[in-house]
Amino acid sequence: MNKKILVAPSLLSADFSILKDEIKKIEDSGADMIHLDVMDGHFVPNITIGPLIVEAVRRCADMILDVHLMIEEPHKFIKDFVDSGSDIITIHAEAYAGEGFKPYPALNNQGLRKGMSKTADNIDEGRVKEVLREIKSFGKKAGVSLNPDSPLCIEGVLEDADMVLFMSVHPGFGGQSFIEAVLPKIKALRKIYSGDIEVDGGINDRNAKSIIDAGANILVAGSYFFGAKDKSDAVKKLRG
């Protein structure tokens, strides 16, 4: 399946003190969309932005806003992110985990820390479908995401998902290394799913080809993009 390769620079790695300038760099680079990571300090061990910042980015950017909700109970905030100007809204399957939910691997009662992420062996498919359908009812694209250690447990919701996002690092912080174990899951999903497959975490010009070859067609790049002197060239190298 030949799908156009899209690049989505992540604002998580941007300098928020000059955010408008950073957005202009994305626009001028030839990238396809802007990726915004929303974190609540509970689902992941970091706090980032909310609807107010998404709305501010919307006012500055004439690009697709790809909003990734790494939060608990995302259904409570869908309308807020719709109203803020999101074009794509992605929720985590682990936010609606069923039996087999592992909230904090190797926790040892110390709280969710960097290098950990919530995992799920199965999900409440009905609940996930409801939220995906709600997102689409507003005319937005709906995505579902999986953390690196979660198995491919979303087959039952694919018909309602415009996009599947694989986290290839443990979510919460930028600058991490790509987790190779995600590649087989991308390959397995592509065999049964014709929609968009997005990958986020540790992506650069050295591993982009293997990710694309596995079946992904949207690459999120944070540290690699904002660390590049020539950002247009960085985007071209990711596309291959």
Residues of each region from the PLM?
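Hydrophobic faces of well-ordered beta-strands that scaffold small-molecule active sites
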Residues: 5-10, 34-36, 57, 65-69, ...
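C-terminal helical cap(s) of enzyme catalytic domains, especially alpha/beta-barrels
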Residues: 102-111, 212, 224-240
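Catalytic cores of alpha/beta
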Residues: 22-23, 73-84, 149-161, 203-219
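Glycine-rich, proline-tolerant flexible connector loops at the mouths of alpha/beta enzymes
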Residues: 34-49, 93-101, 117-119, 169-175, ...
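Conserved, mostly hydrophobic/aromatic
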Residues: 19, 26, 37, 81, ...
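Glycine-rich phosphate-binding active-site loops on the catalytic face of alpha/beta enzymes
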Residues: 89-98, 165-174, 214-234
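Glycine/Thr-rich beta-alpha phosphate-binding loop at enzyme active sites
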Residues: 40-48, 52, 144, 148-150, ...
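Alpha-helix-loop-beta-strand connector modules within alpha/beta enzyme cores
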Residues: 47-68, 131-145, 180-201, 237-240
